[in-house]
Amino acid sequence: KEDAVVYPPQLSREQCSSEQTARYKAELAKRLALETTDNVEVKETEILKDAENLKDIEGLKYIDVLSHSEFSTDVSSTLAVDLTGGFGVDFSFIAPLFDRAIYCERNPQLCTIARHNFRVLGLDNACVANSEAERLLQDMPPANLIFIDPARRDGHGGKTVAIADCTPDVSALRPLLVSKGRKVMIKLSPMLDWHKAVADMCGSVAEVHIVATGGECKELLLVADSDSHDSVSVTCVNDTERFSFTHTEGEQQPLPPLQDAGELFAASPATATSQHAEAPAPLYLYEPNASIMKAGCFGLLAVRYGLRALGRNSNLFVSNAMVNGFPGRQFAVTGCSTMNRQSLKALLADINSANVAVRNMPLSADALRKKLALKDGGDSYVFGTTAADGTHVILLCKRI
């Protein structure tokens, strides 16, 4: 249908953003656009020259030809360029925030689909360019924002993670990217180590955004520019939850004093191994969301919210007073036990089913569920973990 959105091949859909992550990138792009608008230094003659050159680049197949009117002589006019357009989900959310927007994609079929869809969506300020990203980047005019989402599959169709293995190689393009874009937003695999990604960009990264939805880490976003940054701002996002810090702040903050099994049972560690007890009242358990887990800022998280870690590698936290606004799941602990058979029997006497999870424990969740003879599901939550003193403990909880 002429008024219906057309969908691309399966491989292109695999790397598409969800609406929720696309909206977050649009929110970020809007802020970046405002930050760059007052710093436009491109002269009128340069804009016209670049616009004219852009129409005559050898080897480019433009579906929509850029005109002088699209490259306004108003130097306050804003431009966004998506160098790896794909299906155009991110572009369709970012483009309306700018006066002009260029969609670049090397696949001619996707360009045709994008051109149709942009018309359906009413994106009158969008231009579609069938080109390699590297070629357009070389000859395009300066932009307020460049967005790039390198393909994360190799020539054999296998998935890649490292920046250098993606197409195009953003680290190799870095000097040209930051010279042409006042701000550059780079979308990377959530599997990538964000510390290494920042290092690979040689000081150009100003911001890192770790984006999760529904408890699953979806995207790693870098914001780069031509400045050199010793301190990088890191924002962890999970749906409506936000947690921000500088990377030096996160690295320098160690875990506060840990919670050992003796404190959990209100007894000494020496006797805790044979005990089952009602948890000290009240006791609350906190599980960080996926973006926090990816960021690894556990010491800073504990300090900011006044929490204690159950163990050095448990990534679970406790407090005796409920904390509001914690970025993750919160539970009320109703009881706790060691792995002692009689203690477990007393703890789970009235529990037939539960949601079982393990953290830093030599058992899988399925193995622990089987050992405890529990069915999956229900309103109860069972966490198996290792306390600071090495004791394996089981916590029975209710979700708050």
Regions found by a protein language model. Give the residues of each.
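SAM-dependent transferase fold signal centered on methyltransferase-like domains
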Residues: 1-400
